[in-house]
Regions:
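Sec-dependent bacterial lipoprotein signal peptides
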Residues: 1-25
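A structural "domain/chain start" motif
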Residues: 22-63, 67, 74, 82, ...
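Surface-exposed short loop/turn segments
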Residues: 29, 71-73, 83-128, 132, ...
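Second-shell loop/turn segments in exported
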Residues: 48-55, 144-154
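Short loop/edge segments at beta-strand edges and connector loops
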Residues: 79
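Compositionally biased, intrinsically disordered linkers/stalks adjacent to structured regions
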Residues: 150-173
Length: 173
């Protein structure tokens, strides 16, 4: 048996194995979503219905959710008639003391935000849900939730809430 006659079947076997391996990779991606049976999504404007209002957070949240889905999937965004629809409202924006000092002042405060989400999957109605998502950010009691403190708080809170919404709706975690 010559070297060439030995290598030719080996190359064919290797190419076939590689083809099967790569074809299986299309079912899963690094975001954990697997194959999504949809082509389009829409994120309707989330109203701020919290008792305490921080102007502009509803727009920031809506854009964050839209950007996360757009960046982590191959879905196309649309304004109407989408396969997947996200809508809801911000239901809570609350600042509360977490720990106190000896002179009864807040040593640490917590900003909590809750968002009620209605998710509709027009192709698979059994995936639809309405659910509340919330997260918090702790900050120094000497600070107010404004400026850089508020920016950092919203960044962390919205990152967590939007990822939780993404996982619940598309990754099924």
């Amino acid at each position: 048996m010559t070297y060439k006659s030995f290598i030719k079947p080996f190359k064919l076997l290797f190419a076939t194995a590689l083809l099967f391996t790569l074809s299986g990779c299309s079912v899963y991606n690094f975001t954990g979503t697997g194959k999504i049976d949809a082509e389009t999504f829409q994120v309707n404007y989330f109203q701020n219905n919290a008792e305490l209002i921080e102007p502009g957070i509803e727009r920031t949240f809506t854009l964050r959710l839209r950007d996360l889905i757009q960046n982590q999937t191959n879905l196309s965004i649309t304004d109407t008639g989408a396969d997947l629809i996200y809508e809801g409202e911000i239901t809570q924006y609350r600042v509360s003391p977490m720990t106190a000092t000896a002179d009864q002042r807040a040593a640490q405060n917590r900003l909590s935000i809750s968002v009620n989400v209605r998710f509709t999957d027009r192709k698979h109605e059994d995936n639809d849900f309405e659910k509340s998502f919330s997260f918090f950010y702790d900050f120094n009691g000497d600070s107010l939730p404004s400026g850089s403190v508020l920016t950092a708080a919203l960044e962390e809170i919205f990152e967590r809430i939007t990822q939780d919404i993404f996982n619940a709706s598309l990754a099924k975690w």
